[in-house]
Amino acid sequence: KLFGTVANKKLVILGFAFKANTNDTRESAAITICKNLLNEGANLIIHDPKVTASQIEKDLNINPAISLENESSSFDEKPKSWEHIKSISNLEVFNNAYAILILTEWEEFRRLDWKEIAKRMIPPAWVFDSRSIVNTEEIYDSGLRLWRIGDGLVD
């Protein structure tokens, strides 16, 4: 449903730790999900408030020489496979993204400005909420499509 492929698509990953309020990535579902998306050719922007870029590289078995830790404020250029960002307060991170995947239930992800984010994304833009933390009404009012574990496509 995501244009038939994720190859060369910008996807924003929100959360990498196995649960909120920790930097522990052991057995995190995000590892498998991100590996599979990278293997399919997706371009990932990864944000977790506590997990470092070096930990993500280790978990994904990525050579640091080919990864990029983005500390700049320009998110319009395509990432090189993946980028780690320390903050999502600058909503430019969502520019030209096809989907957002919420993989950890951080409190800050509950308070995102979905209407503003939706304006920056490429339609039909998706939110994949693996933690059931977003407000369904806010997502639909913003024009985004929502998929949840256990619910599938939420209409």
Predicted feature locations:
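Structural/interface elements that position substrates and couple domains in central-metabolism enzymes
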Residues: K1-D155
